């Protein structure tokens, strides 16, 4: 499956805590922040690097510079992605930030998504756009958000970041944007009749903000 699983042991530990129904909102929110940072570090491994010579207080040393950190744009899906993006920004402090507010709508058993606010920075061809949403379930919300990204320009790389994804969500995104890169901490098999991921972790936004 064309998705990169973040199998770092601490990421999997945090996911276990997030899945636990007994984890309170404060710890849940903190867990999303920590996961965002870990995922950010994993993404940084995919950036090109160059070796540079620097002066320490005591002599010369050879180090590494990561190319393109100033080209990162992080787009968050309100509100569930806020803690996750807080962690991503710790890994990419130079990133420009975009926000898309989406609301699920269900009519006659059909789930759709309405976008009621969108503010995405202008996108250049050498930008790396990271779209973050904790749950990639049906892929409908993510698809709507990616459409907003492309209205702002065509990025050099499009990266989708989720805590938990499903085969359906992955397929929906890649069928429209085959060059998209998807990162998740886990892929769960199914959705229930409310389009929530099973076993998943529940409603990420409600659990993070105690609503």
UniProtKB/Swiss-Prot annotation:
Family of this protein: Belongs to the UPRTase family.
Organism: Pyrobaculum aerophilum (strain ATCC 51768 / DSM 7523 / JCM 9630 / CIP 104966 / NBRC 100827 / IM2)
Enzyme class: transferase
Activity regulation information from UniProt: Allosterically activated by GTP.
EC number, UniProt record: 2.4.2.9
SUPFAM superfamilies: PRTase-like
Cofactor detail note: Binds 1 Mg(2+) ion per subunit. The magnesium is bound as Mg-PRPP.
The keyword DNA repair appears for this protein: no
Binding-site list for 5-phospho-alpha-D-ribose 1-diphosphate: 79, 104, 133-141, 203
Function of the molecule: Catalyzes the conversion of uracil and 5-phospho-alpha-D-ribose 1-diphosphate (PRPP) to UMP and diphosphate.
Protein name: Uracil phosphoribosyltransferase
Cofactor: Mg(2+)
Binding annotation for GTP: 30-34
InterPro entries per UniProt: PRibTrfase_dom, PRTase-like, Upp_A, Ura_phspho_trans
Annotated binding of uracil, by residue: 197, 202-204
Gene: upp
Keywords: Allosteric enzyme, Glycosyltransferase, GTP-binding, Magnesium, Nucleotide-binding, Transferase
Pfam name, any one: UPRTase
């Amino acid at each position: 499956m064309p998705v990169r699983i973040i199998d770092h042991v601490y990421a999997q530990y945090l996911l276990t805590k997030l899945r636990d129904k007994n984890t309170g909102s404060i710890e849940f929110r903190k867990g999303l922040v920590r996961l965002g940072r870990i995922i950010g570090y994993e993404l940084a491994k995919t950036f090109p690097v160059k070796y540079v010579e620097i002066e320490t207080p005591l002599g010369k040393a050879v180090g590494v510079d990561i190319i393109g950190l100033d080209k990162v744009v992080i787009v968050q899906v309100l509100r569930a992605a806020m803690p996750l993006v807080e962690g991503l920004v710790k890994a990419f402090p130079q990133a420009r930030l975009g926000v898309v507010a989406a609301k699920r709508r269900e009519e006659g058993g059909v789930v759709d998504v309405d976008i009621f606010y969108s503010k995405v920075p202008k996108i250049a061809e050498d930008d790396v756009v990271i779209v973050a949403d904790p749950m990639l379930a049906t892929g409908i919300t993510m698809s709507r958000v990616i459409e907003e990204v492309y209205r702002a320009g065509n990025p050099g790389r499009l990266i989708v970041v989720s805590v938990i994804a499903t085969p359906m969500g992955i397929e929906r995104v890649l069928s429209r944007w085959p060059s998209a890169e998807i990162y998740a901490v886990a892929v769960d098999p199914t959705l229930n009749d409310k389009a929530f991921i099973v076993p998943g972790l529940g409603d990420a936004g409600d659990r993070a903000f105690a609503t």
